[in-house]
Amino acid sequence: MKKITLLLYVFCICSNIYSQQIKKNVKKTITEYPELEAVIKHYKKNGNKEKLQAAYFLIANIGNKGTYTNDLVDSKGISVGYDISNFKDETAEKKWLDSVTAVRGKLHEKETFLPDLKNSTAPFLINNIDRAFEVRQKSPFCKDLTDAEFYEYILPYRVGTEKLEYWRDQVLNDFSASQKDSIYSFSTVLAATSYIDKIYQKKFQFGGNRYFKEKKVRSYSELLQDKSGKCDDMCNLMVFALRALGIPSGFDGIQYKRASNDVGHGWCFVLDTKTKKNYPFDALSNNGPGFFNLPYKNAPKVLRKQFALISPNSIKNDQSVIHPNLFEDNSLDVTSEYFETTNLTIPLEKKYQGPIYLSIWNNGWWKPVDYSYDTNQTTAIFNNVSKENLYCLTKYRYFSTEEASEPFIINKFGEIKHINSLPSKKDINLNEYKNKELKNAKNNAKILEFDTKKEICKKIVEENITKNEWSIISENHLKTNTLYHFVDEPNNMYKIFLLKNDGSVDWY
C-alpha cells in the first residue's frame, strides 16, 4: 500500500513544495460551494490562522466523503421501516421480515449517498473546528501534539459514512464536570482511555454475528440509541468520545484473516504524545490500551483509516484501472507495527499494462491486498509485506482476478519460497497427522488438489460403528509440501493448507 500524503498538511505547512494544481482545486471547491466559502471567510475575518489552516485541511480532503443511507424498501421503493436493532436475535428478525414480505412483496435494499460537499453547512464545520481547538487547549493529552497529528486524530468532523451531527457537543454533554475532571487528572493517556472505555461498556455491547451484514454506519446518537452492534460500531463510538474529549485516537484493522473465511476485524488506538507511540486496544473490552494482543496470525495487511485523501495522481482514483477493493482507498499501511514484515522486489516475466496485485487466499479465491504499477515495469515492488504467509501475484481483467504467478510463501527470513520448488515431497497418510482441524473435520469434508480441484479424499464419520477417518478416493497420493483445498460445504469452510515433513500443518 503506497504511503498516503496528508493533502493540506503539506499545503499549509510546506506550501512551497506543494503542487499549484492542488491549490487551484481547493480554491475552486471553495468557490463552487458557498457553505465552504463561508467557513473560510469566517476565519479570515477573525484573523485566526491556525483555524483557517484547519478549515483548509478539512475542505481539501472532503473529496467524495459523505453519508450513505441504507433502507429496505418494497417494489414501489417505499421503506418498510427495517431496523436491525429492533430484534433480539436472527429468529425474531426473520419472522418480522417474512411477515412484511407476505404483505409488501419482495424487498430490496436501497442505498442513497449524500455528499458532504453539498450537505455540510458552515455552522456545522465551524462548530467542529472550534470544539476541536478548545479541547486541544484543555486536554493534557494533546500536549506536544503536532498539527499533522491533530488534523488526523482530533479534528475530523466524521469517522465514517454516518449522518452528520454535532457529536462533539453530545459527547461533552454526556459527561459530568466531575467525570471530565477525572479524565484530565490521569497521568497517562492509557489510564484516561480505560476510564472512558469502561463508561461506554455500560452503554453499548457487541450484538452478535448478525450485525456483520449491516452496512449502515451509525452516528454517535444512533449508536447510543441502538445499544449494540459489531466491532466497527464499537470502535466508532470510542473514537467519537476520545476525540471529543481531546485524546488523539484512530482506527486500525485487517480486511482478511489468515486461514479464515470470517470477516475482518477493527480496533482502536490512542496516541501517547509523550512517547509518540500508538497503543492499540479492542474497543469496549476488558483489555484496555497497553494490553492488546492481536489474535490473528500474520494477517497480510493492517490498515489505518485516514481522513486525508490520497494523492490526486494515484491510480487508485481511476476506477477503470484499479481493482474495486482498492479504489479510492486512502488507508495507511501500518502492518509493520503489528507483524514482522519485509519488502519484496519480484522480477516479472513480461510487462503488464495494468497493475500487478499481491493477493492472499480468502473464501475460495485470491483477494488483492496491495498493488505495484509502472507502465514500464519489469519488477513488481511491494513494501511492508507480512512474513510467514501465502501469496500469489494476480492481475485484474474484465472484472475477474487471474493468477499471474504460482503461489509462494514468504518465510520468517523474508525469502520467497515457491510451492513447486519446496523439497522432499513425501507420500503420507492423512489419518496419521495429529492436526486438530483435520482430525475433527466433519463428515463429507473433502480434500482437493489445488490446481485441478480434483477430489483426493473425503472424511467418513459413522457414529454407529465409530468410524472417523479420511478415505482415499483417488489414485493420487497426498504429499508433503504441496497445497491442497480443504472444503467443508455445510459449514461454509474453504481453506487451503500445506502438509509439512515434520507432521505439522500450515493453514492459509
Summary of predicted features, one role per range:
Residues 34-38, 46-226:
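Secondary-structure boundary elements
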Residues 316-342:
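Beta-strand-rich domain onsets/edges
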Residues 340-350, 428-440:
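A short, amphipathic beta-strand motif
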Residues 355-373, 446-462:
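Short amphipathic beta-strand segments in non-cytosolic proteins
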Residues 1-22:
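Bacterial Sec-dependent N-terminal signal peptides
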Residues 26-30, 42-47, 182-199, 211-221, ...:
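Hydrophobic/aromatic-rich core segments of domains that either
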Residues 378-399, 469-490:
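Short Pro-Gly-centered beta-turn/loop motif in secreted/extracellular proteins
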Residues 397-423, 490-508:
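Structured interaction patches on ligand/partner-binding surfaces of diverse proteins
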